[in-house]
């Protein structure tokens, strides 16, 4: 079993000075915490794995292919592999749990 406390992950993320903190990686799934500052730029590229975002805190917009929508606390967004996507118009620091299936970079 793997178990995590969100408050501890947020603290670890702050200490890491990185935008993305991967905290679980098994063959069929990986998980991480992604934090973007208010007004920040999300420079990610499409991934070779399916992805789910769960917004823990903050407010922004996300563009997935040609669709655009607001996200806020509690929003859940599924992005299929190889689809262009990014957060933008980040109004409040955005903290997002990220789930990749299979594990990130396992389809390269």
Language model features with spans:
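Short acidic-glycine-tyrosine-enriched beta hairpin
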Residues: 67-81
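Conserved short histidine dyad/triad with adjacent acidic residue
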Residues: 17, 32-47
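A short, N-terminal "cap"/entry segment at the start of jelly-roll beta-barrel domains
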Residues: 1-33, 108
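Short, charged/polar surface micro-motifs in flexible loops or helix N-caps
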Residues: 27-29, 37-41, 59, 102-105
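Short, conserved beta-strand element in jelly-roll/cupin
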Residues: 35-36, 47-62
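Histidine-centered metal-chelating micro-motifs
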Residues: 41-42, 61, 77, 81-86
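Ligand-binding loop in jelly-roll beta-barrel domains
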Residues: 81-106
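Short strand-coil-strand connectors
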Residues: 27, 63-67, 90
